[in-house]
């Protein structure tokens, strides 16, 4: 499953099977025998994690009833806001056998006071008013910031995760990926982190786009198809 917010408008758009900057290469994975589902997610104020759970997990549960779907071997992938939701979801359900998160926010309390390196904009607006939709500042609703931060719920996670977060990311500080990675390592959970030196929020160099596609294929083939893990 691949998600961000809503993808219905792209339902009939052609997706070229070329290496992508970070998004799931839907055409490529379908050509390898995977079924890829991209649910729409709609949000309410203060509950982005819960809303993602209700849309994504309910979709997964319904898909698992289909005879052409292997309900025991499902995975999730997302980038940026989608990556955040991947990290949050694996602390809320064990239905997915593997997960891949690009440039995720792991801790809204530490990300709240930062800036976007590319523009210098303070990040507070994002959490209060726009994409994160918390609807209050950090001190008014500390509980919601913690409730919607994967880092604080990591002991519940059972899902192997790959994180891609690059050291020149101007949108989401890469220390967010580091917090998720070191937290899972501290708890003895299965996690890997990719950092393409000098790359931004989305991969620019074609060689890196090709590399991440190979690694993503190897990861999902290993955990979902039972193939040998990459060395």
Label every model-predicted segment.
Residues 1-6, 12-231:
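Active-site-proximal cap/loop segments of hydrolase catalytic domains
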């Amino acid at each position: 499953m691949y998600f961000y917010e809503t993808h219905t408008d792209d339902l009939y758009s052609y997706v070229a099977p070329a290496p992508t900057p970070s998004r799931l290469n839907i055409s490529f994975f379908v050509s390898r025998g995977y079924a890829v589902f991209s649910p729409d997610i709609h949000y309410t104020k203060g509950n982005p994690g819960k809303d993602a759970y209700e849309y994504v997990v309910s979709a997964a549960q319904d898909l698992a009833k289909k005879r052409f779907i292997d309900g025991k071997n499902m995975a999730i992938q997302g980038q940026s806001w989608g990556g955040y939701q991947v990290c949050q979801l694996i602390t809320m359900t064990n239905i997915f056998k593997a997960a891949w998160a690009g440039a995720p926010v792991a801790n809204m309390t530490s990300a709240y006071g930062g800036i976007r390196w590319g523009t210098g904009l303070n990040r507070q607006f994002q959490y209060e008013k726009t994409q994160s939709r918390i609807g209050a500042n950090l001190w008014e609703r500390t509980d919601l910031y913690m409730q919607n931060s994967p880092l604080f719920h990591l002991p519940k996670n059972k899902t192997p995760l790959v994180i891609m977060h690059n050291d020149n990311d101007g949108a989401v500080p890469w220390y967010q990926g580091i917090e998720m990675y070191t937290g899972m390592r501290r708890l003895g959970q299965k996690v890997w982190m990719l950092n393409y030196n000098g790359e931004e929020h989305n991969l620019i160099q074609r060689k890196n786009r090709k590399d991440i596609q190979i690694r993503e294929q190897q990861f999902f083939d290993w955990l979902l198809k039972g193939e040998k893990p990459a060395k």
